[in-house]
């Protein structure tokens, strides 16, 4: 499969964004409760796709796997940009 020169559009609907936000918050808390560095663990999962970065504790692993990693990245970028004054 080759790459195209045309720009491809990617969009999430608002319901997906809210679900991803809830999931990330829940997973963060579960990681924190288990004594992990939540940021490092979530980054490890998002970059590698390896669910072993997220514990089964509080069903965190199953929760985060319900979302595609690219959708998680989109929500993280959107949240960061909004927090830095960018109107989206």
Swiss-Prot record:
<dbReference type="InterPro" id="IPR009309">
    <property type="entry name" value="IreB"/>
</dbReference>
<dbReference type="Pfam" id="PF06135">
    <property type="entry name" value="IreB"/>
</dbReference>
<protein>
    <recommendedName>
        <fullName>UPF0297 protein SSU05_0066</fullName>
    </recommendedName>
</protein>
<comment type="similarity">
    <text>Belongs to the UPF0297 family.</text>
</comment>
């Amino acid at each position: 499969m080759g790459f195209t020169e045309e720009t491809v559009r990617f969009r999430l609907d608002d319901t997906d964004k809210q679900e991803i936000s809830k999931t990330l918050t829940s997973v963060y808390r579960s990681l924190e409760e288990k004594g992990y560095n939540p940021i490092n663990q979530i980054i490890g999962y998002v970059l590698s796709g390896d669910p072993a970065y997220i514990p089964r504790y509080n069903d965190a692993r199953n929760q985060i796997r319900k979302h595609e990693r690219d959708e998680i990245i989109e929500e993280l970028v959107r949240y960061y940009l909004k927090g830095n004054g960018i109107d989206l």
